[in-house]
A protein has these predicted regions:
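Bacterial Sec-dependent signal peptides at the C-terminal "C-region" and cleavage site
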Residues: 3-7, 11-25
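Scaffold/interface architecture of coatomer-like assemblies
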Residues: 19-295
Length: 295
């Protein structure tokens, strides 16, 4: 999502030397949505046209002004890896799967960054178009400390994902436990909405016998509210399958734009609902809404 042209957003990193005082100007004329449609047995549907979609904001029909079929718009990928003590035994499997994912998903115009989070949040590698460079950084990750999952989402969305027309995606690899964040779950979701970020998560809660329902709920809420999806493989061997599904989904998304009929600058959350009147058996997934600009 982009914000109105007249809005100037200044974001300053608060994470020390890893984050360097950027000033970000965000200009937005319309609401941009990335949309995933699935049909029978969860298969991706890729042949729909603009006339198939109806867009509603707070229950009011909106005119779709721009549309493209499964898009090759450049990707901005934020890879967030949990390196807390609770994932110590799983980390090596996670590192290999994450490395393979970057090699498979990134194309020439795509960019990715790497963040690790434990007790704090650290930018390990800034945006690059070279997956091999990030993979080398992934190899050096070590486990230890608490967990600041929500802070990682909040700070990456705020300080690295605002502005531009690229598709913005955060992929989390974590058990979903959060012990050290200063920001709440809702604050993390709100910042992702404001930055137009879709969140995907691969939860490691089902590895072994110790399930963490709270961790799973956190990951599900983060992903569902932003139009993404959470995966919970039962073994480290299935990590690659989850990454493959994320890769496939990122390459089968529709891009849709509408100009809101409600022009109030009240800063309120606007609920978005897309419908496929002639294809009611299809499932459609997108972010739940956006925040209007404020004076």
């Amino acid at each position: 999502m982009r914000a109105p042209k007249t809005i100037l957003v200044v974001a300053i990193f608060l994470l020390g030397s890893s984050f360097q005082d950027p000033q970000i100007r965000v200009e937005v004329e319309a609401v941009n949505l990335l949309v995933t449609v699935t049909g029978d047995k969860g298969r991706f549907v890729t042949k729909l046209v603009q006339q198939d979609f109806q867009s509603y904001e707070d229950g009011r029909l909106q005119e779709v002004t721009n549309f493209s079929q499964p898009t090759d718009l450049p990707l901005q990928i934020g890879l967030l890896i949990d390196t807390s003590s609770s994932v110590r035994l799983k980390l090596e499997f996670e590192k290999r799967a994450a490395s393979d994912f970057l090699y498979s998903v990134m194309r020439d115009k795509d960019r990715a960054l790497l963040v690790e989070f434990d007790t704090g949040v650290s930018l390990i590698h800034d945006f690059t178009r070279r997956p091999g460079s990030i993979v080398q950084s992934i190899k050096n990750l070590r486990a230890g400390g608490g967990t600041a999952l929500i802070d990682a989402i909040y700070l990456v969305s705020r300080d690295k994902m605002f502005g531009g027309t690229d598709r913005k995606t955060v992929v989390i690899l974590s058990d979903g436990r959060d012990l050290n964040s200063r920001h709440t779950l809702q604050e993390g979701i709100e910042m992702a909405h404001r930055a137009g970020v879709i969140v995907y998560a691969i939860g490691t809660t089902r590895f072994g016998t110790n399930l963490d329902d709270k961790g799973e709920r956190t990951l599900e809420e983060l992903t569902e509210s932003t139009g993404g999806r959470a995966f919970f493989p039962y073994s480290t061997e299935r990590l690659a399958d989850a990454f493959d599904l994320i890769n496939e989904e990122l390459r089968t998304q529709y891009s849709l734009t509408f100009v809101p009929s409600n022009t109030k600058r009240d800063g309120k959350f606007r609920e978005i609902k897309l419908k496929l009147p002639e294809h009611k058996n299809f499932n459609i997934r997108h972010r739940r809404g956006y925040f209007a600009p404020s004076e």
